[in-house]
Amino acid sequence: MQPLHGNCLIAYARHKYILTMVNGEYRYFNGGDLVFADASQIQVDKCVENFVLVSRDTLSLFLPMLKEEALKLHVHKKVPSLLVHHCTRDIPVFQEVAQLSQNKNLRYAEMLRKRALIFALLSVFLEDTQFIPLLLNVLQPNMRTRVCTVINNNIAHEWTLARIASELLMSPSLLKKKLREEGTSYSQLLTECRMQRALQLIVIYGVSIKRVAVSCGYHSVSYFIYVFRNYYGMTPTEYQERSAQELPNCGSAASMAAQGIFYGTDRSAEGIRL
Protein backbone atom coordinates (compact mmCIF):
# COMPACT_ATOMS: atom_id res chain seq x y z
CA MET A 1 0.00 0.00 0.00
CA GLN A 2 1.06 3.62 -0.44
CA PRO A 3 3.01 5.23 2.43
CA LEU A 4 0.86 7.55 4.53
CA HIS A 5 3.26 10.47 4.84
CA GLY A 6 2.04 13.29 7.06
CA ASN A 7 -0.39 11.06 8.97
CA CYS A 8 -0.16 9.42 12.37
CA LEU A 9 -1.69 6.29 13.79
CA ILE A 10 -3.01 5.60 17.28
CA ALA A 11 -3.37 1.91 18.08
CA TYR A 12 -4.80 0.41 21.27
CA ALA A 13 -4.02 -3.13 22.37
CA ARG A 14 -6.82 -4.62 24.43
CA HIS A 15 -4.89 -7.90 24.48
CA LYS A 16 -1.48 -8.95 23.20
CA TYR A 17 -1.06 -7.28 19.85
CA ILE A 18 1.33 -7.15 16.88
CA LEU A 19 2.05 -4.27 14.51
CA THR A 20 3.91 -4.88 11.27
CA MET A 21 6.39 -2.22 10.19
CA VAL A 22 6.90 -1.43 6.50
CA ASN A 23 10.41 -2.89 6.74
CA GLY A 24 8.93 -6.24 7.77
CA GLU A 25 9.77 -5.91 11.47
CA TYR A 26 7.16 -7.04 13.99
CA ARG A 27 6.47 -4.98 17.12
CA TYR A 28 4.75 -6.71 20.01
CA PHE A 29 2.50 -5.00 22.58
CA ASN A 30 0.72 -6.06 25.73
CA GLY A 31 -2.88 -5.44 26.68
CA GLY A 32 -3.36 -1.82 27.75
CA ASP A 33 -0.64 -0.40 25.49
CA LEU A 34 -1.57 2.77 23.61
CA VAL A 35 0.66 3.36 20.58
CA PHE A 36 1.37 6.58 18.72
CA ALA A 37 3.18 6.01 15.43
CA ASP A 38 4.24 7.50 12.13
CA ALA A 39 1.62 5.94 9.86
CA SER A 40 4.04 5.82 6.94
CA GLN A 41 6.11 3.28 8.88
CA ILE A 42 3.22 0.92 9.69
CA GLN A 43 1.32 -1.57 7.56
CA VAL A 44 -2.03 -0.23 8.69
CA ASP A 45 -4.03 -2.75 6.68
CA LYS A 46 -2.98 -5.36 9.24
CA CYS A 47 -4.71 -3.66 12.17
CA VAL A 48 -7.94 -2.12 10.88
CA GLU A 49 -10.00 -2.85 14.01
CA ASN A 50 -7.43 -1.59 16.48
CA PHE A 51 -6.28 1.74 15.14
CA VAL A 52 -7.33 5.31 14.46
CA LEU A 53 -5.65 7.10 11.58
CA VAL A 54 -5.04 10.78 12.39
CA SER A 55 -4.84 12.94 9.29
CA ARG A 56 -2.38 15.73 8.66
CA ASP A 57 -5.22 18.26 8.90
CA THR A 58 -6.18 17.05 12.38
CA LEU A 59 -2.55 17.04 13.52
CA SER A 60 -2.20 20.59 12.21
CA LEU A 61 -5.10 21.64 14.44
CA PHE A 62 -3.57 19.91 17.47
CA LEU A 63 -0.14 21.47 17.04
CA PRO A 64 -1.19 25.11 17.66
CA MET A 65 -2.54 24.05 21.07
CA LEU A 66 1.03 23.53 22.25
CA LYS A 67 3.28 26.30 23.50
CA GLU A 68 5.20 28.05 20.74
CA GLU A 69 8.48 26.89 22.30
CA ALA A 70 7.66 23.42 21.00
CA LEU A 71 7.92 24.61 17.42
CA LYS A 72 11.38 26.04 18.02
CA LEU A 73 12.70 22.52 18.43
CA HIS A 74 14.69 21.26 15.49
CA VAL A 75 13.21 18.26 13.77
CA HIS A 76 15.30 15.40 15.07
CA LYS A 77 17.07 13.21 12.54
CA LYS A 78 16.80 10.23 14.86
CA VAL A 79 13.46 9.79 16.54
CA PRO A 80 11.55 6.56 17.12
CA SER A 81 8.85 5.67 14.61
CA LEU A 82 6.44 4.91 17.44
CA LEU A 83 5.85 5.57 21.14
CA VAL A 84 4.10 3.38 23.70
CA HIS A 85 2.14 4.44 26.78
CA HIS A 86 0.85 1.66 29.01
CA CYS A 87 -2.59 2.53 30.36
CA THR A 88 -3.51 1.27 33.80
CA ARG A 89 -7.20 1.14 32.92
CA ASP A 90 -9.34 0.63 29.84
CA ILE A 91 -9.97 3.46 27.36
CA PRO A 92 -13.69 3.26 26.57
CA VAL A 93 -13.57 6.21 24.19
CA PHE A 94 -11.11 4.49 21.85
CA GLN A 95 -13.75 2.27 20.27
CA GLU A 96 -16.00 5.29 19.78
CA VAL A 97 -13.20 7.20 18.06
CA ALA A 98 -12.50 4.21 15.81
CA GLN A 99 -16.15 3.97 14.84
CA LEU A 100 -16.44 7.69 14.15
CA SER A 101 -13.25 7.58 12.08
CA GLN A 102 -14.72 4.90 9.82
CA ASN A 103 -17.90 6.91 9.20
CA LYS A 104 -17.53 9.18 6.18
CA ASN A 105 -20.86 10.99 6.71
CA LEU A 106 -20.52 12.53 10.16
CA ARG A 107 -22.75 15.32 11.38
CA TYR A 108 -21.03 18.51 12.49
CA ALA A 109 -21.40 17.69 16.19
CA GLU A 110 -19.96 14.22 15.56
CA MET A 111 -16.98 15.73 13.73
CA LEU A 112 -16.32 17.96 16.74
CA ARG A 113 -16.59 15.02 19.11
CA LYS A 114 -14.27 12.83 17.03
CA ARG A 115 -11.65 15.56 16.91
CA ALA A 116 -11.96 16.25 20.63
CA LEU A 117 -11.51 12.57 21.46
CA ILE A 118 -8.50 12.27 19.15
CA PHE A 119 -6.92 15.26 20.87
CA ALA A 120 -7.58 13.62 24.23
CA LEU A 121 -5.77 10.47 23.05
CA LEU A 122 -2.86 12.50 21.70
CA SER A 123 -2.57 14.34 25.01
CA VAL A 124 -1.69 11.05 26.73
CA PHE A 125 1.76 11.26 25.10
CA LEU A 126 2.54 14.89 26.02
CA GLU A 127 4.83 13.93 28.90
CA ASP A 128 6.97 11.75 26.61
CA THR A 129 10.01 13.80 25.58
CA GLN A 130 10.04 12.10 22.17
CA PHE A 131 6.41 12.93 21.38
CA ILE A 132 6.88 16.45 20.00
CA PRO A 133 10.01 15.53 17.99
CA LEU A 134 8.12 12.59 16.46
CA LEU A 135 5.07 14.74 15.79
CA LEU A 136 7.19 17.41 14.12
CA ASN A 137 9.08 14.77 12.17
CA VAL A 138 5.83 13.44 10.77
CA LEU A 139 4.05 16.73 10.25
CA GLN A 140 6.97 19.02 9.42
CA PRO A 141 4.81 22.09 10.11
CA ASN A 142 4.87 24.86 7.54
CA MET A 143 5.32 28.53 8.36
CA ARG A 144 1.57 29.08 8.43
CA THR A 145 1.21 26.58 11.28
CA ARG A 146 4.13 28.08 13.19
CA VAL A 147 2.71 31.60 12.93
CA CYS A 148 -0.77 30.45 14.00
CA THR A 149 0.74 28.68 17.01
CA VAL A 150 2.39 31.89 18.17
CA ILE A 151 -0.78 33.94 17.65
CA ASN A 152 -3.09 31.42 19.32
CA ASN A 153 -0.99 31.35 22.48
CA ASN A 154 -1.82 35.04 23.05
CA ILE A 155 -4.69 35.87 20.74
CA ALA A 156 -5.39 39.31 22.25
CA HIS A 157 -1.80 40.55 21.86
CA GLU A 158 -1.18 43.41 19.43
CA TRP A 159 0.83 41.30 17.03
CA THR A 160 3.06 42.79 14.36
CA LEU A 161 5.10 41.09 11.68
CA ALA A 162 8.28 41.99 13.57
CA ARG A 163 7.00 40.59 16.87
CA ILE A 164 5.93 37.29 15.32
CA ALA A 165 9.25 37.01 13.49
CA SER A 166 11.06 37.57 16.79
CA GLU A 167 9.09 34.74 18.42
CA LEU A 168 10.11 32.45 15.54
CA LEU A 169 13.75 33.52 15.70
CA MET A 170 13.91 34.97 12.19
CA SER A 171 13.91 38.34 10.45
CA PRO A 172 10.63 40.03 9.44
CA SER A 173 11.68 40.01 5.78
CA LEU A 174 12.36 36.26 5.83
CA LEU A 175 9.04 35.55 7.55
CA LYS A 176 7.19 37.72 5.05
CA LYS A 177 8.90 35.91 2.18
CA LYS A 178 8.10 32.44 3.53
CA LEU A 179 4.46 33.33 4.10
CA ARG A 180 4.21 34.80 0.61
CA GLU A 181 5.57 31.53 -0.78
CA GLU A 182 2.73 29.76 1.03
CA GLY A 183 0.19 32.19 -0.44
CA THR A 184 -0.65 34.05 2.75
CA SER A 185 0.46 36.90 5.02
CA TYR A 186 0.77 37.53 8.75
CA SER A 187 -2.22 39.92 8.72
CA GLN A 188 -4.38 37.33 6.98
CA LEU A 189 -3.38 34.64 9.48
CA LEU A 190 -3.97 37.02 12.40
CA THR A 191 -7.51 37.62 11.18
CA GLU A 192 -8.11 33.90 10.61
CA CYS A 193 -6.89 32.97 14.10
CA ARG A 194 -8.94 35.69 15.77
CA MET A 195 -12.08 34.82 13.83
CA GLN A 196 -11.74 31.13 14.66
CA ARG A 197 -11.27 31.94 18.35
CA ALA A 198 -14.23 34.33 18.21
CA LEU A 199 -16.39 31.56 16.78
CA GLN A 200 -15.36 29.21 19.59
CA LEU A 201 -16.19 31.78 22.26
CA ILE A 202 -19.54 32.63 20.71
CA VAL A 203 -20.80 29.17 19.76
CA ILE A 204 -19.25 26.94 22.43
CA TYR A 205 -19.09 29.25 25.44
CA GLY A 206 -21.86 31.77 24.66
CA VAL A 207 -19.63 34.73 25.58
CA SER A 208 -21.06 38.21 25.01
CA ILE A 209 -20.03 39.99 21.81
CA LYS A 210 -18.23 42.74 23.73
CA ARG A 211 -16.15 40.27 25.72
CA VAL A 212 -15.36 38.27 22.60
CA ALA A 213 -14.09 41.38 20.85
CA VAL A 214 -11.75 42.23 23.73
CA SER A 215 -10.60 38.62 24.14
CA CYS A 216 -9.69 38.47 20.45
CA GLY A 217 -7.66 41.68 20.47
CA TYR A 218 -10.21 44.17 19.13
CA HIS A 219 -10.54 47.48 20.97
CA SER A 220 -13.65 48.45 19.00
CA VAL A 221 -16.74 46.23 19.14
CA SER A 222 -18.13 47.76 15.96
CA TYR A 223 -14.89 47.02 14.10
CA PHE A 224 -14.92 43.46 15.42
CA ILE A 225 -18.46 42.99 14.12
CA TYR A 226 -17.38 44.47 10.77
CA VAL A 227 -14.47 42.02 10.46
CA PHE A 228 -16.61 39.09 11.62
CA ARG A 229 -19.32 39.86 9.06
CA ASN A 230 -16.77 40.15 6.26
CA TYR A 231 -15.20 36.84 7.29
CA TYR A 232 -18.31 34.73 7.94
CA GLY A 233 -20.96 36.56 5.92
CA MET A 234 -23.12 37.37 8.94
CA THR A 235 -22.89 39.19 12.25
CA PRO A 236 -21.81 37.41 15.46
CA THR A 237 -25.38 37.52 16.77
CA GLU A 238 -26.76 36.03 13.55
CA TYR A 239 -24.16 33.26 13.65
CA GLN A 240 -24.96 32.53 17.28
CA GLU A 241 -28.68 32.22 16.54
CA ARG A 242 -28.06 30.02 13.50
CA SER A 243 -25.72 27.71 15.44
CA ALA A 244 -28.25 27.35 18.25
CA GLN A 245 -30.76 26.04 15.71
CA GLU A 246 -28.34 23.69 13.91
CA LEU A 247 -26.51 22.23 16.92
CA PRO A 248 -29.08 21.49 19.62
CA ASN A 249 -27.33 18.27 20.71
CA CYS A 250 -23.64 19.15 20.76
CA GLY A 251 -23.40 19.21 24.54
CA SER A 252 -20.78 16.46 24.68
CA ALA A 253 -18.40 18.21 22.31
CA ALA A 254 -19.02 21.53 24.00
CA SER A 255 -18.31 20.01 27.40
CA MET A 256 -15.00 18.59 26.21
CA ALA A 257 -14.11 21.90 24.63
CA ALA A 258 -14.76 23.65 27.91
CA GLN A 259 -12.24 21.34 29.57
CA GLY A 260 -9.53 22.44 27.17
CA ILE A 261 -9.38 19.20 25.18
CA PHE A 262 -10.64 20.51 21.86
CA TYR A 263 -9.48 24.11 21.79
CA GLY A 264 -6.14 25.62 22.67
CA THR A 265 -6.02 26.61 26.31
CA ASP A 266 -3.30 26.26 28.88
CA ARG A 267 -5.13 23.29 30.34
CA SER A 268 -4.85 21.42 27.05
CA ALA A 269 -1.13 21.01 27.63
CA GLU A 270 -1.72 19.09 30.84
CA GLY A 271 -3.12 16.09 28.98
CA ILE A 272 -5.11 13.29 30.55
CA ARG A 273 -3.78 10.50 32.68
CA LEU A 274 -4.59 6.87 31.92
Curated annotation (Swiss-Prot):
Induction: Expression can be activated by RpoS and repressed by CRP, H-NS and GadW, depending on the conditions. Pfam families: HTH_18 (PF12833). Residues 145-242 form the HTH araC/xylS-type domain. GO terms for molecular function: DNA-binding transcription factor activity; transcription cis-regulatory region binding. Transmembrane segments: none annotated. Keywords: Activator, DNA-binding, Repressor, Transcription, Transcription regulation. Disulfide bonds: none annotated. PROSITE patterns: HTH_ARAC_FAMILY_1, HTH_ARAC_FAMILY_2. Residues 162-183, 209-232 bind DNA. GO terms for cellular component: cytosol. Positively regulates the expression of about fifteen genes involved in acid resistance such as gadA, gadB and gadC. Depending on the conditions (growth phase and medium), can repress gadW. Homodimer. This is HTH-type transcriptional regulator GadX. The lineage of its organism: Bacteria, Pseudomonadati, Pseudomonadota, Gammaproteobacteria, Enterobacterales. The gene is gadX.
